Regions:
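Low-complexity, glycine/alanine/valine/leucine- and proline-rich hydrophobic stretches
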Residues: 290-291
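N-terminal signal peptide c-region/cleavage motif recognized by signal peptidases
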Residues: 13-15
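Short acidic, glycine/serine/threonine-rich helix-capping segments at coil-helix boundaries
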Residues: 332-339, 347-391
Length: 414
């Protein structure tokens, strides 16, 4: 019911706002774009007759009711059907994928995994008009500078003849094509893979795949090295060491008793690696390598990077997780409101969880780690329901005593 009234308010108020402000904003933007060299023909084709899209604003402002556990995230993305389809495409597109691996050093299975996660192998490219969506977001104000820049780049792509304004479709946030490139990413990394003089990431798979491989190579991909692998941690493992920022050579982890999930020796990999626990100390554990950081440049989500690694592993013939994510750890997820409650309580106890926004960012994770260290809990930074219950209990007791600030504790960085 609350959602209904919110949407009703948007539908009633937004057109008034649009009529009074959007047209003048768009006129000023057109002048700016023309001054930057965008042709009048492109401006007319892309911007004439557009209006703010209420659906785009709704999607941009929406916050999920519940956080998504790693088990849920992986279960929705690394499915049997997606693995099977990926294996089929690995064979069907062997010539293209082999050529890309040779040229860029990106494994075939990794490119297929990105393709599967971004658009389900081209099945869901998005149907939003990109110029209209970006203009809506640039006008709305929350991240206007970013989307204004993206809109200018989208117009430059049209102006260069890569796609028509009518055919520039994608996600509500402006991501385009098989690999969901933002316009700025397109202009920086997109490649004409089929040699026809245009870069068509919507219809040309060689263009889309070459562009993705080029991006990953430029982001620092390490050939012949993994993104992540599932590991088994020894009894008595110091959970404080399980965080992305804590990097050790693989041989150091071996000396600490870490093995692969099936109890085999860890692979020999150059560089330093970290242990991450996406669902807390009771869930699956992963060792992540330099290529994990490369994937995080594509999408700043630990769960996304692990899903890329796991889908690539299974598409290449590897097994599913040994420690099944859905059966390990605390199955429940906090609601956004519950996480806000935890953040507020941690802040009031002097542990600096950052803005009370219901988003599990690095500052919130660090504050949880500090709290866990103070209370002799496994220090994993994970907002499990049991941790929330203890935080609320501690906060209530401290508030009743008039001494909310907790004693100093070790510092952690995610």
């Amino acid at each position: 019911m609350r959602k209904f009234f919110f949407l009703l308010a948007v539908l009633v108020a937004f057109p008034v706002h649009a009529q009074t402000g959007f047209d003048s904003w768009l006129a000023a933007f057109r002048q700016e774009a023309a001054a930057q060299g965008i042709s009048q023909a492109t401006l007319d084709a892309a911007l004439t007759g557009i209006a703010p899209a209420e659906r785009v604003i709704d999607l941009d402002r929406r916050q999920p009711e519940f956080l998504q556990t790693f088990a849920d995230y992986l279960g929705r993305r690394v499915t049997e059907s997606r693995v099977s389809r990926g294996q089929t495409l690995l064979q069907e597109q062997a010539l293209l994928l082999d050529a890309l691996e040779q040229a860029y050093g990106i494994p075939r299975s990794v490119l297929v995994a990105f393709w599967g996660l971004e658009t389900n192998y081209g099945a869901t490219l998005g149907s939003h008009n990109i110029p209209a969506s970006l203009a809506t977001l640039a006008f709305d104000g929350r991240r206007s500078g970013f989307f204004r820049s993206q809109l200018l780049d989208a117009l430059r792509i049209i102006d260069a003849g890569h796609v028509s304004a009518a055919n520039m479709k994608g996600s509500w946030a402006g991501a385009m094509g098989h690999m969901q490139f933002m316009p700025s990413t397109f202009r920086a990394y997109a490649v004409d893979g089929d040699g026809d003089g245009r870069i068509d990431v919507w219809q040309s798979l060689p263009d889309a795949m070459n562009s993705a491989a080029h991006y990953l190579q430029r982001a620092g991909w390490h050939a012949h090295e993994p993104v992540a692998l599932e590991v088994r941690l020894p009894e008595g493992f110091d959970w404080r060491q399980a965080r992305v920022s804590h990097r050790l050579p693989v041989e150091k982890w071996t000396a600490l008793g870490v093995t692969t999930a099936d109890a085999m020796a860890l692979p020999t990999v150059a560089g330093r690696s970290a242990i991450v626990l996406p669902q807390g100390w009771q869930g699956p554990a992963f060792m992540v390598f330099d290529n994990f950081d490369v994937v995080m440049q594509w999408n700043r989500s630990v769960n996304y990077a692990l899903a890329v690694a796991q889908l690539a592993h299974q598409v290449a013939g590897g097994s599913a997780l040994v420690a099944r994510a859905g059966e390990a750890g605390e199955a429940g997820a906090l609601s956004t409101l519950q996480l806000k409650t935890m953040q507020q309580a941690l802040n009031e106890m002097g542990l600096d969880a950052g803005t009370v926004d219901g988003i599990l960012g690095p500052r919130t994770q660090t504050a949880i780690r500090v709290y866990q260290a103070l209370h002799q809990l496994p220090v994993d930074g994970y907002p499990a329901p049991s941790v929330l219950a203890q935080v609320e209990q501690t906060h209530a007791a401290a508030a009743a005593s008039g001494k909310l600030t907790l004693a100093p504790a070790p510092t952690f960085a995610e």
